[in-house]
Amino acid sequence: MEEIQGYLQPERSQQHNFLYPLLFQESIYALAHDRGLNRSISFKNTGYEKKLSFQIVKRLITRIYQRIYFTTYSSNKSQIFGPNKSLYSKLLSEGFAFIVEIPFSLRFILERKKILKSQNLRSIHSIFPFLEDNFSHLNYVLDILIPYPPHLEILVQTLHYWVKDASSLHLLRFFLHEYCNFNIFITPKRSRSPFSKINQRFFFFLYNSYVCEYESIFLFLRNQSLHLRSTSFGALFERNIFYGKIECFVKVFAKDFKANLCLLKDADLSMHYFRYRGKSILASKGTLLLMSKWNYYFVNFWQCSFCLWFHTERIYISQLSSHSLDFMGYLSSIPLTPSTVRSQMLENSFLINNAIKKFDTIVPIIPIIGSLAKAKFCNVLGNPISKPVWADLSDSDIIERFGHIYRNFFHYYSGSSKKRSLYRIKYILRLSCARTLARKHKSTVRAFLQSLGSEFLEEFFTSEEQILSFTFPNASSTLRGVYKRRIWYFDIVCINELANYQ
């Protein structure tokens, strides 16, 4: 353990960066399963780390470098790991991912003081007040679908800047070429490969390192092009959800795109950049022509920097006044709200019509109904159905589960400007709960509710928890009036699973 801690010292790591010998440390695999460097990802401890020894790791790595073993193919055995592919690949890949994270963790530790100084409320809802204050002045949004590298060598070259150990990079090449389809790393939920299901740390590390590389290039080019420093904000949740905003965001690739310097460089332009669910979103108060130039710039950037044939169809230019932005489970837009003001001057009166921009957040009811249908609470049309898998639970547990789901929905979408759609969700969950209870007692829904009363389920779906929020009502205001307002909570640290629709 002391030897591993020695590799975490900045002075020693900067001198040689030799991470490959750590693969032969048995305790490194126990750390990979128990806690990790930052305890960011929790893995289920299945007890197979007890089966690991120095001889197993040495034998597996030796097999990787045996050319004759690669040429031997069997339909029942893996090329490298043999019949215990699921076990050995998980051991080595998680251990390798844990070790190769050391340079990044050192960077995180060195910059920890700067991160603590940032104003981070550690709440997803803290983002929306910022959007309300700033997005009302913006006009267009670039919705960019982040491309994935088609060639595996791009991933290796990305890590080459941080990991100087050639042996570790060679081992990474063997891992990637053994599972040659990179889609199993970037889409683990959709893949049926067992490797994609058991290598979450490896998947997150590859994806985050790739995204961190291209965003660091943007930040570097921005600081080189303008004297005005950008203001950054970061919140890191479980290492896979990252949000950042940059004011006056202008980046010019002066080396390869000198001709675009006069087109994009504008110190007075206010722009905001953030990344969410595999997308990069760039919002600006500029014109459509300027956003088209940014579209052209991004295409050339990906092609020249990462050798990616990036199509313009992967970038959507939307006007906030007429289109909604899918962000953090909300459909956000800035519609023009007409407002008429009557002015009286002596005997003359005037009617002044003004169009006011207002940040609007809407609950995406159709995708949420699709998520409820996928979770077997209703059909695709939104008609409630029973939940047979919960029929074996007690009545109180069934009601509490349905009520807990609805309360989570209500709390997360409390900032919506139109809450009428929440009653549709309440209707689906309430009737699904009644159907589940009636199925358990082998009765009809009507007979079950008549025996217990119509208010039996109402109290479980209307009782709200007292949670500190951004809205502090007056003593004279009623509870009903409070919930008509938009409320942003301090304790929302993750999106509801049913709200995080695919």
UniProtKB/Swiss-Prot annotation:
Gene Ontology molecular-function annotations: RNA binding
Keyword check for RNA-binding: yes
Top-rank taxon: Eukaryota
InterPro entries: Domain_X, Maturase_MatK, Maturase_MatK_N
Record-level GO cellular component terms: chloroplast
Location(s), subcellular: Plastid, Chloroplast
One GO term (biological process): RNA splicing
Keywords from the named record: Chloroplast, mRNA processing, Plastid, RNA-binding, tRNA processing
UniProt key word tRNA processing: yes
Family affiliation: Belongs to the intron maturase 2 family. MatK subfamily.
Function, in words: Usually encoded in the trnK tRNA gene intron. Probably assists in splicing its own and other chloroplast group II introns.
Protein name listed in UniProt: Maturase K
Organism: Ipomoea purpurea (Common morning glory)
Recorded name of the encoding gene: matK
